[in-house]
Each structure stands twice: as structure tokens, then as C-alpha cells.
UniProtKB/Swiss-Prot annotation:
GO terms for biological process: canonical Wnt signaling pathway; cell proliferation in midbrain; commissural neuron axon guidance; dopaminergic neuron axon guidance; establishment of planar polarity; hair follicle development; inner ear morphogenesis; midbrain development. InterPro entries: Frizzled/SFRP (IPR015526), Frizzled/Smoothened_7TM (IPR000539), Frizzled_dom (IPR020067), Frizzled_dom_sf (IPR036790), FZ3_CRD (IPR041769), GPCR_2-like_7TM (IPR017981). Disulfide bonds join C28-C89, C36-C82, C73-C110, C99-C133, C103-C127. It comes from Mus musculus (Mouse). Residues 23-205, 259-288, 350-374, 442-477 are extracellular. The keyword Signal applies. Lys-Thr-X-X-X-Trp motif interacts with the PDZ domain of Dvl (Disheveled) family members and is involved in the activation of the Wnt/beta-catenin signaling pathway. The FZ domain is involved in binding with Wnt ligands. Residues 227-237, 310-328, 396-420, 499-666 are cytoplasmic. This is Frizzled-3. Expressed in the cortex, diencephalon, rostral brainstem and little or no staining is seen in the striatum or cerebellum. Expressed in both hair cells and supporting cells in the utricle, saccule, cristae and the organ of Corti in the inner ear (at protein level). Highly expressed in the CNS. In skin, it is restricted to the epidermis and to the developing hair follicle.
Amino acid sequence: MAVSWIVFDLWLLTVFLGQIGGHSLFSCEPITLRMCQDLPYNTTFMPNLLNHYDQQTAALAMEPFHPMVNLDCSRDFRPFLCALYAPICMEYGRVTLPCRRLCQRAYSECSKLMEMFGVPWPEDMECSRFPDCDEPYPRLVDLNLVGDPTEGAPVAVQRDYGFWCPRELKIDPDLGYSFLHVRDCSPPCPNMYFRREELSFARYFIGLISIICLSATLFTFLTFLIDVTRFRYPERPIIFYAVCYMMVSLIFFIGFLLEDRVACNASSPAQYKASTVTQGSHNKACTMLFMVLYFFTMAGSVWWVILTITWFLAAVPKWGSEAIEKKALLFHASAWGIPGTLTIILLAMNKIEGDNISGVCFVGLYDVDALRYFVLAPLCLYVVVGVSLLLAGIISLNRVRIEIPLEKENQDKLVKFMIRIGVFSILYLVPLLVVIGCYFYEQAYRGIWETTWIQERCREYHIPCPYQVTQMSRPDLILFLMKYLMALIVGIPSIFWVGSKKTCFEWASFFHGRRKKEIVNESRQVLQEPDFAQSLLRDPNTPIIRKSRGTSTQGTSTHASSTQLAMVDDQRSKAGSVHSKVSSYHGSLHRSRDGRYTPCSYRGMEERLPHGSMSRLTDHSRHSSSHRLNEQSRHSSIRDLSNNPMTHITHGTSMNRVIEEDGTSA
């Protein structure tokens, strides 16, 4: 018997101390419950053994048992109830419970009467919970340890009870919810800080920004699909970066359409249940929104880090495009593997929370620890690594600009490329740093916001008000709007990188049902124009001006740079223009009706005339054209080819290629 009492007292002490662990004071107070007057003791403590934080709440819970007490169904029933609702107050840390035999007698003698009044026997009052003994309550040894109430103690003793979950916010224990470190509790919906009209404005604001970001990132991705070979390393990560934020903006847009149907649990007035925030993975729709949003948010940041890595490899060790592309598998494994691992960990820890402002589900909205370790820590790490590599690459490019003598045109291209990298990085880093700043501010002041909310709603929810509140504050809506704005706008800079004349030409070709044509196809198209003969009659010393079809910001490093190709084309233009145009005419000659070739159909290069203008030339013009072609084109071609030295085409690094092409694409 003694051993069982010791074991049970230890268990009860653990439970009781856990209940009042957040209370800064423990004191005895006079019993004010009408049902518990005229007992051998007159002091009690709160919260009691049934988790009633004050005597008023305990009195409300005892009301269903008044008929049984008034009808005196058992002389043990009233002492048994008071032992639970107003237990005897002894020195701190000593708690005693009624004996099991006392409970069994009260139950057997009053259970039928309780059934008549429709009052069920509470689960907290099951007799198997109490120690196996047969002694009255309170025991004589307990009466000797009764504490005296504090002199002049008021009826309602002010103590720090901590947060007590209201009945309206309680959740089924199987779901594993938690709010303000209280289990089986969830925050209220709509948001606990803002009014409905403020939430409505915020939701439409987030929806508008998500549409803008979705349009920009989708345009970037579709531009990539039109010409996949245009964007290669070191710039290929920009495309995956855009895809990630395209998915992020899509999830926010879906949240705007869903409102709070996924982020919040439905209310149940019949069970006194208010609408609460969704937590955990039991809600499949909320889980899917969380997985996509968190995964692509982290993946977008990792792809930005990989972009800085590829720029660093191209600028400092001068890696070529093919060398960087060989590491593509490692890049993809890191960019998708790290966010995937973090997402799986959060799913296993059941850290999903509904966002009743944006309508999506994320992590760290109410759990500060999850925010600190799964949002702030990764983002800060990505920023530090990315900025370090970015600065190293820019410093290397600037050293090249200063130390290596370059032509003025190449100097301007290099400066322009450095400015472009800097602007793109600033457009990404500034919004991301603002988001990180909002998260830090939120975690620093969240405790004050929660205390203010409890202070304002404690009487409405009938829960203890905060004890000795020294500071009260409510969050500003602009803080949350800024956080969502910067979290979405961070994906828009990708459109500035693909914006060029080349992009406009590709989209124009796409909408006209044409694909990009090669230079050979363009030359053949020129040969088929009806006024081509007139172009042959011009002065051969006049340089050929070709229309630009736009240039790409990408290409392979095995090709010559655009500047070198332009030099070769200019050197060959005088001799090669007549040669290519006249030689292409040879295949279009026709025989005359008597089976002979026309006089201008000799095999020699100098004696060929274009077919496209034959029908419009008179005999005089034909002979004059042939004479001028024979004399001028032959001499000019030989002179130009003999004077121009052989030009060698060299292979450049991927950074040189990007710099040169960048100068012509903007």
C-alpha cells in the first residue's frame, strides 16, 4: 500500500508540476465554491487537478452535478467532487487525491440518478485513475499540512497562469496540433492579428503580385523553350531559377483562389469549435501546397547560388561552356536534392501550418523554431555563399578590364556585361534580404504580439489573462505585405536577362509560324529576289550591308566569337559576295529551244549571269552586264583575295563569348 502511494504521488506530482510549469506563483486561496463550503478544509489552489485555472471556471464545470448533490444521492459524492474541483491546499509540491473506494461508492450510488438527468460520468473522474485505498478525503495527515491563505488575499488571486487553450480552439489529440507550446490547440481563423477587411485587401494584393510574377517567369521559360540551345552554361541556371519562382507564384495564385478553405479548418458551432489554422499533414491539399511552395522556394535560392558558381568558374579559372556543362548533373543533384531533403524532414516532423493571410501552407508561421532552422538558416547560408562567389567573379572581371589591354569596343562590352550581372544580382538580393529582415523582425516581436492578443481576447475566450503585461504591440499589415511582395518579386529579374532584340525576333518568328533561319537560308532568299540583278551592277568596292537578325546571349564555346566572324565576313564580302551570288546561278540555267546553251552559260565563274533578271534585260543590257561582270568582278575578286591575309578563327572561353554576344543582344 505504501509503495503504491509513493508511486502514485510521484506520478501526480509530475503531472501537476507540468500543468503549472508556466506559473510564476503558487499560493493558497480561500474556497469560494458554494458546493464545497463547510468542509474540513477551507483553502484550495488553482489550477486544480482538472485543469480549471480559477474557481469561477471550476464552478461552471460543477453545475451539471448540482441535482445529485441537492438530492443527496451519496454522502461521499460531494467530498469526492470537491477533492477534484477544489483540492486541499498544502505546501508547494504536495498533492493528494481521493481514494479509489471513495470514487467507487460515489459512482455506484449516484450513477442511476445521473443517467436520469442525462449527465455522463466524466472520463477524468474514472475510478481506475485514483490510488487503491479506503480513506476519507482529506486524510488526517493532510489536514496537518494545510496552508493558510495569504492575509488579505482577494477572491480572485492574480497569478501567471500562462496560456490556457480556449475550448473553441481545442483540437482532437490525434492530430498533434500545438499553439503557444500548448498541445491539442490551434490558432484561430481568420488571422488573429488583422480584421477581415485588412485580410481581404492583403489577399487581393498577393493575388495581383502573383499574377505579375507568374507572367514574367512564364515568359522567360517559354523563351527558353523556343530556342533551347540559346541559353547554355554559365547562364542556364537562370532558366531553372525562373521555373522555380514560376511555381512559387502559381501556388500563391492558387491560394488566392482558395481563400482560407485549405489553410483553415471549418468551424463546428454545435461542438463549440471555432475555425482554426490547419496544421500537420492530415489535410492533403494543404500538404501539397506546402510541399510545392517550400520545395521551389528553397530550390530557387539554390539555383541562384549555382548561377553564381557558374559565373565564378567562367570568370576566375576561365572554364569553357562545355567544362561547366559537365558539372550539370552535380548542379541538378544539389538544386533539387537539398530542398527535397528539407521538405521530407518537415513532413516527418509534422511542421506544416496554414497561412490564413495568403491562403497557402508553409512552415514557421506560428512555430518560431521551425522558422529559425528551416527558413532563416538556409536563406542566410545561400546569401552568404552566393554573394561571396559573385564578388569574386566581378573582381576577376574588373582585373581583366584593367590589366589586359583591350579594344575600346571590347572594353565597353566587358563593362556592360559587369553592369548587367550587378543589376541582376541586386534585383535578386535586395528583395531576398528584405524577406529575411521581415522574418527576423517577426520572430523577435512575435511573443509580444501573442501576449497582446491574449490580453485582448482572454475575457472573450474565458481564459486567464496575462500576468503583469509590461509591453503590448500589434503587427502592422504593411510588414506582411512587404514580405509577400518581396518573396514574389524576387523571381521577376529573370525577364531582364532574356530581354533582348534576339528574344523579340524569336517571338516574332514564332507567332508568324517561322523558325530561326540559318545564314545560308538567308542568302538563298536574297538570290530569289527579282531585283537581284541590279545589285550585281553596283560598284564592287561598295561593302555589303546585311540585316541583323538579332544575336543571342548564348552559344557554344566551340564556335568563333561574334567579333571574329564579323571580321572574316567583312574581309570576304567584296570578293565572296559576287562569287556566291553568281555561282548560285549556275544550277538555274536553261537550254534554248534548239538545245543549245545561251551565250552567258559558260562554265567559268566570270561569265555567269543571274537567272532572276533575264526576262527583264534587253540585249544591250545583257551584253553590258556580261562585259562589266567579266572585267570588274574578276579583277576585284583576285585583288581582294590576294591582298587579304589568311584569318585564323580561335576558340574563346564561355565568359568571352558571353561578353561579346552580350554587347550585340541588348
